[in-house]
UniProtKB/Swiss-Prot annotation:
Protein source organism: Synechococcus sp. (strain CC9311)
Disulfide-bond pairs as recorded: none
SUPFAM superfamilies: Peptidyl-tRNA hydrolase-like
Protein name: Peptidyl-tRNA hydrolase
Record's GO cellular component terms: cytoplasm
Gene that encodes it: pth
InterPro entries per record: Pept_tRNA_hydro (IPR001328), Pept_tRNA_hydro_CS (IPR018171), Pept_tRNA_hydro_sf (IPR036416)
Length: 207
């Protein structure tokens, strides 16, 4: 993805108030933060099976999509949006939560496997390729060993961020929103050099 290519940013998540503040919905959170900052609003688009916001105009218009299909069928909405707008894969970026990264870390990649994430699995299935950009947003993993992690995965990703995590989450969302602008202005490689090197930490309140 070169600078100026980005046209569609998709945040992965689950629809409904029940899931609104869960770790699995951090992609939705980032898009809502960006739309709020830019004065945009989401509207229902049944033909895309999602909610859509438009930012900017003309050649600089950026569309934000939150699939309403539930996580495991996200690819259906993404495929519909690409077809409806006539976008190519190099114009797409997917925002996704990642348990393999701690909260405070980001990883921008031009392509890759699903890594066990059902939303990415669905996207790869419906697009027929792994060759699309994705920004993985760390949410941390439950437990210290594989068996504990496996047992607690569902409750972790469908659980809300704790009050202690919220200040760091706020910093992460700000970096993601700023990172989208970096991608537009600099392209994927240069933006990735910055985003992939971040190691955000909560602001200390100690005197």
């Amino acid at each position: 993805m070169n600078r100026g290519d980005l046209r569609l940013v998709v945040g992965l998540g689950n629809p409904g108030n029940r899931y609104a503040n869960t770790r699995h919905n951090v992609g939705f959170m980032a898009l809502e933060r960006l739309a709020s900052r830019e004065g945009g609003g989401f509207r229902s688009m049944p033909k895309l099976q999602g909610q859509l916001a438009d930012l900017g105009s003309g050649d600089k218009r950026l569309r934000l999509l939150m699939p309403q299909t539930f996580m495991n069928d996200s690819g259906r909405s993404i495929r519909a949006a690409l077809d409806w707008f006539g976008f190519e894969l190099h114009q797409l970026l997917v925002l996704v939560d990642d348990m393999d990264l701690p909260l405070g870390r980001l990883r921008l990649r031009a392509r890759g496997s699903a890594g066990g994430h059902n939303g990415l699995k669905s996207t790869i299935q419906h697009l027929g390729t792994q060759d699309f950009a994705r920004l993985r947003i760390g949410i941390g993993a439950p437990g210290q060993n594989p068996s504990e992690r496996k047992a607690r995965t569902v409750s972790h990703v469908l659980g809300s961020f704790s009050r202690d995590e919220e200040p760091l989450l706020d910093k992460v969302l700000l970096e993601v929103v700023d990172g989208l602008e970096r991608i537009q202005l600099q392209g994927l490689d240069l933006a990735g050099n910055h985003l992939n090197g971040l190691q955000l930490a909560p602001t200390s309140t100690e005197e």
